[in-house]
């Protein structure tokens, strides 16, 4: 059984949802990035969603764009990212690890080479933010060849046809968008998601994780009560890094507290 399936089964048995933080690999430096990831795991993260920094992050709001710039300026190349991913996998053999990134990085490496590198580093899933599902075939074929789950986005305004495609072609989990637009804790999660979750369930989709604008424990609880298998929080996590760049101890302390609070909200009584 794969890591995502094991995680969702384990959590369902305890009446819990998953809480998944996102950070950019190498932010603010590769060394501190490892300490941050260790803190996320130690504080209760159920899985990790990690970004490979890219110079033109289209779907990201200002917080994650700033993280990308910090990571690039500290010398975080794709090679460094894969070295860190290999270390993370060795430390946390059961933790699901997903990448959230842009197609240019995949094309630069070569699609086949990229997915092989992911498999070698122990990555479980890849979400390519700027590849719509109807253009995803060559990525899906390579992902399948190397045992990597292709993750697809279910947007809030999706037609039933789109949700059917997402359900049939995706693996691992389904990234459920709470609203359209760019990422960011600056803009809160939007529409009720119950109808989307019901439609995905009808099509036997991989479990849905709600993302975009998730910054408070109440939102995690609401997502799970509406039928999502959990929630992903990116900008709110990265904002804590940004706000504590001059004090790494405070950064790790604040990150730990945030993760503990968000994870506590995923436990339904």
From Swiss-Prot:
Active site: 49 (proton acceptor), 60 (proton acceptor)
Keyword Lipoprotein applies: no
E.C. no: 4.2.1.20
Pathway stated in the Swiss-Prot or TrEMBL entry: Amino-acid biosynthesis; L-tryptophan biosynthesis; L-tryptophan from chorismate: step 5/5
Catalytic reactions of this protein: (1S,2R)-1-C-(indol-3-yl)glycerol 3-phosphate + L-serine = D-glyceraldehyde 3-phosphate + L-tryptophan + H2O
GO-annotated molecular function: tryptophan synthase activity
PROSITE patterns: TRP_SYNTHASE_ALPHA
EC class (word): lyase
GO cellular component, one term: cytosol
Coiled coil start-end: none
Pfam families xref list: Trp_syntA
Keywords: Amino-acid biosynthesis, Aromatic amino acid biosynthesis, Lyase, Tryptophan biosynthesis
Top-level taxonomic group: Bacteria
Role: The alpha subunit is responsible for the aldol cleavage of indoleglycerol phosphate to indole and glyceraldehyde 3-phosphate.
Family listed: Belongs to the TrpA family.
Subunit structure: Tetramer of two alpha and two beta chains.
Database matches in HAMAP family: Trp_synth_alpha (MF_00131)
Protein name per the record: Tryptophan synthase alpha chain
Organism for this UniProt entry: Photobacterium profundum (strain SS9)
Taxonomic lineage from the root: Bacteria, Pseudomonadati, Pseudomonadota, Gammaproteobacteria, Vibrionales
Gene expressing this chain: trpA
């Amino acid at each position: 059984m794969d890591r995502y399936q094991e995680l969702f089964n384990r959590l369902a048995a305890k009446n819990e949802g998953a809480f998944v933080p996102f950070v950019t690999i190498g932010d603010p430096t590769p060394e501190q990035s490892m300490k941050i990831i260790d803190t996320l795991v130690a504080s209760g993260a159920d899985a990790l969603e990690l970004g490979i920094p890219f110079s033109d992050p289209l779907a990201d709001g200002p917080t994650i764009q700033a993280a990308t710039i910090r990571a690039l300026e500290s010398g975080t190349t794709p090679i460094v990212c894969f070295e860190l991913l290999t270390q993370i996998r060795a430390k946390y053999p059961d933790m699901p690890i997903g990448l959230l990134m842009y197609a240019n990085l995949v094309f630069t490496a070569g699609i086949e080479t990229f997915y092989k590198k992911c498999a070698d580093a122990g990555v479980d899933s890849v979400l390519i933010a700027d590849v719509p599902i109807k253009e995803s075939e060559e990525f899906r074929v390579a992902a399948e060849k190397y045992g990597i789950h292709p993750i697809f986005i279910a947007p809030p305004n999706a037609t039933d046809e789109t949700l059917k495609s997402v359900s049939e072609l995706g693996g691992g989990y389904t990234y459920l968008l709470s609203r359209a637009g760019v990422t960011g804790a600056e803009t809160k999660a939007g529409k009720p998601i119950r109808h989307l979750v019901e439609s995905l369930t009808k099509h036997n989709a991989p479990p849905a994780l709600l993302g975009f604008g998730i910054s408070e424990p109440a939102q995690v609880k609401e997502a799970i009560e509406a039928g999502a298998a959990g929630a992903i929080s990116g900008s709110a996590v990265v904002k804590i890094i940004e706000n504590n760049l001059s004090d790494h101890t405070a950064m790790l302390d604040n990150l730990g507290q945030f993760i503990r609070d968000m994870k506590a909200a995923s436990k339904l009584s």
